[in-house]
């Protein structure tokens, strides 16, 4: 299976650099994965596609203000993208610099002193030596780490709009974007309809934006992300399945978390890392339907939806979305695949 099979041509003007005024004002492309039938709706119509007894599973991870700036002791400028926090003074980060800082060197994160303890590929392990910890630095100086394809600096409204309304557990470098469409009003309508809701956590890493760079899909090494699928979520899923309801994952992060926890055919609580890679030929044991945004060409995420719905059907749906001028990527429109 070739990576190029998952390529498509996207007019640049369809990349959504800014959110719509209202979260739930997006469009929703409905795709029947059995028949390939495609239909155009508003996102608020989603309430009509779910039934009492269904279970929606959301990722409650919160985006960190992960972009920070600083310098070397020489004054040379540094830009940080915090990837993972080990403890309040120890964290992994990407560093953009004219010349990479050496292991053992002392640098500044904003105006706070830090030491480079280790480097693995493009990832640095830093320890803060000053009084402030990384959480305080992010709170005081941090920026929302918008995806590179938006080609703009973050603005004040992004701090709210690049978070889901139910975000709780701090740790992501990127938003679980399928959830961005859900307003507080829509969440209430879902509850009022008798549809059950559950929350898992997957802290999205920066690897989510990386295109697959090997020719053969199966050779790709997936990045690892931290997930939590609690026992009560597993109980809800088992109950839903027993009663004939559907498990509907909100976003590919929820899909990957649930399928990690259900890899043995039975959903079990899971806490730890996952590097699960779902591509055509892989089996889904837990998820019956999903809400997802439109994904980058040749990405692991377009491979995931192609595994769920069949590659030809996905490519046709994407061609339809382009012809109908849907908005793409993080601040773009969504699909309901069932």
Curated annotation (Swiss-Prot):
SUPFAM superfamilies: QueA-like (SSF111337)
Coiled-coil ranges (or none): none
Record EC number: 2.4.99.17
GO biological process: queuosine biosynthetic process; tRNA wobble guanine modification
UniProt enzyme class: transferase
Keyword Ribosomal protein recorded: no
Substrates-to-products reaction catalysed: 7-aminomethyl-7-carbaguanosine(34) in tRNA + S-adenosyl-L-methionine = epoxyqueuosine(34) in tRNA + adenine + L-methionine + 2 H(+)
GO CC terms of this entry: cytoplasm
GO MF terms, alphabetically ordered: S-adenosylmethionine:tRNA ribosyltransferase-isomerase activity
Recorded metabolic or biological pathway in which this protein acts: tRNA modification; tRNA-queuosine biosynthesis
Subunit structure: Monomer.
Function: Transfers and isomerizes the ribose moiety from AdoMet to the 7-aminomethyl group of 7-deazaguanine (preQ1-tRNA) to give epoxyqueuosine (oQ-tRNA).
Family statement drawn from the similarity comment of this UniProt entry: Belongs to the QueA family.
Protein's name according to its UniProt entry: S-adenosylmethionine:tRNA ribosyltransferase-isomerase
Organism of derivation: Francisella tularensis subsp. mediasiatica (strain FSC147)
């Amino acid at each position: 299976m070739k990576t190029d099979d998952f390529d498509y041509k996207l007019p640049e003007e369809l990349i959504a650099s800014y959110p719509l005024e209202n979260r739930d004002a997006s469009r929703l492309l409905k795709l029947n994965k059995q028949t390939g039938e495609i239909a155009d709706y508003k996102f608020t119509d989603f309430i009509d596609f779910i039934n009492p007894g269904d279970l929606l599973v959301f990722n409650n991870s919160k985006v960190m203000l992960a972009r920070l700036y600083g310098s070397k002791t020489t004054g040379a400028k540094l830009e940080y993208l915090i990837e993972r926090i080990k403890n309040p003074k120890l964290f992994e980060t990407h560093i953009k610099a004219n010349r990479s800082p050496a292991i053992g060197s002392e640098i500044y994160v904003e105006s706070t002193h830090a030491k480079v303890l280790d480097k693995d590929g493009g990832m640095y392990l830093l320890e803060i030596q000053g009084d402030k910890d990384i959480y305080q630095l992010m709170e005081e100086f941090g920026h929302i780490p918008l995806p590179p394809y938006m080609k703009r600096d973050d603005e004040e409204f992004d701090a709210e709009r690049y978070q889901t309304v139910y975000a709780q557990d701090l740790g992501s470098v990127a938003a679980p974007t399928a959830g961005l469409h859900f307003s507080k009003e829509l969440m209430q309508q879902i509850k009022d309809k008798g549809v059950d809701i559950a929350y898992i956590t997957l802290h999205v890493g920066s690897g989510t934006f990386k295109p697959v760079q090997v020719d053969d899909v199966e050779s790709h090494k997936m990045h690892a992300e931290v997930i939590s699928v609690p026992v009560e979520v597993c109980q809800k899923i088992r109950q839903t399945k027993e009663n004939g309801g559907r498990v509907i994952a909100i976003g590919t992060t929820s899909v990957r978390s649930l399928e990690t926890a259900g890899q043995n055919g039975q959903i079990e609580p899971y806490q730890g890392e996952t590097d699960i890679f779902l591509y055509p030929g892989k089996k889904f044991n837990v998820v019956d339907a999903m809400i997802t945004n439109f994904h980058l060409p040749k990405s692991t995420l377009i491979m995931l939806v192609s595994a769920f719905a069949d590659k030809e059907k996905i490519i046709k749906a994407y061609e339809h979305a382009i012809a109908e001028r849907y908005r793409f990527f993080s601040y773009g429109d969504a699909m309901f695949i069932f």
